[in-house]
């Protein structure tokens, strides 16, 4: 036999109210906001009628948001904003920085961008040394091609299929004028791509800080000189003051050799890095190799710098959502 008190409690709770018991006796519950009186179950009433009334009330709430006073549901608004963000997704951004000049940032940036493109990743490279960037010379490009002298109207120059370059301005004196505009245009450059790598210059500026704040990962490049490590340490402290998460940093020991004054372990201790990626010295300047044989020939060679950059990407790209497979036939780079 149906226990009417239990049915009253159950169907009443399903309708949006719960009887309160004080001293063992249920108190009369006030109707919920906008609840039909027919849904209030009286002692001895029909539980099926209460259940049907509760279902009708639920349908009314779903169809008519009048209970919100005509205002937009904040949960729906948040979901709409998240959907819009996903629709306008930006490619991962990797910034290549260093504490001092001459550490080989440009070489590392070019190799990483070219290798990523060779794996079918649609990659753009931003030449961030706005004063003396010479990628145009490296790739044998015409000086009259579009460049970042006007970032808002600068289309990328295609170097190889899937590898595009945003060239530095032709005239060094415009660098200071365009760096703020370039920082604002970086999100546009990230749309429609799968990966964006941004080089920087020897002098840190607001543009450098903007890249670090926007990036998903940044490569801190040092070389064999103790002075480059000391400069990188100061750069790391600046990143900390900018509140750039340290987890985004990857330390790259460029031009590594067994005869270097510093070991990779010492560099890691100095910069408080668990891992240091070592890119071996290629013995020949990268720009000369590019001009002589082109990107494809360089990447297909057994150049130690190429192998080191390949291993760097194999370790780093999964952290930004890109997969990169190192060729089994090639010698891997060194992680110390």
Q: Where is each model-derived feature located?
A:
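G-domain G4 guanine-recognition motif of GTPases
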Residues: 223, 249-261, 279-284
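Inter-motif core of Ras-like GTPase G domains
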Residues: 205-226
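Acidic-aromatic/histidine active-site loop/patch
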Residues: 1-93, 143-152, 237, 241, ...
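Well-ordered beta-strand positions
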Residues: 195, 217-220, 275-277
